[in-house]
Amino acid sequence: MLIFRGTDWYKGLSSEEMQQVSDKWMTWFKGLMASGKAVAGNPLEREGKIVGKNRVVSDGPFAESKETIGGYFLLKVDTMDEALSIAKDCPGLPFGIRVEVRAVAGECPMLEEVREAQLAARA
């Protein structure tokens, strides 16, 4: 999965520059979709809500965060290196976007730990 961080990267660009980057971004994404390397991807709205420990709902993301998530691509690749190679082609990198590359877990890590603890207790 590619997670795109930074939402104000285009500030200071002219309309023409923004259009050029947008065109490059869409060409990149459509190419990944056509090749089967990307299976989904969307930008995220700027506003959201956060539910915490006591089920208190607060506004988010917070303005002081410089790492606001702006969107994602869900990839279908064989290796982390392949995902990293795709991330390095992100048209937003020269403008300050940061791309986090994460594998989607096949199982919740907590459930895996519980299962391992149960197996250890039986041994």
Each model region followed by its residue ranges:
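Conserved, structured core segments of small domains
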Residues: 1-123
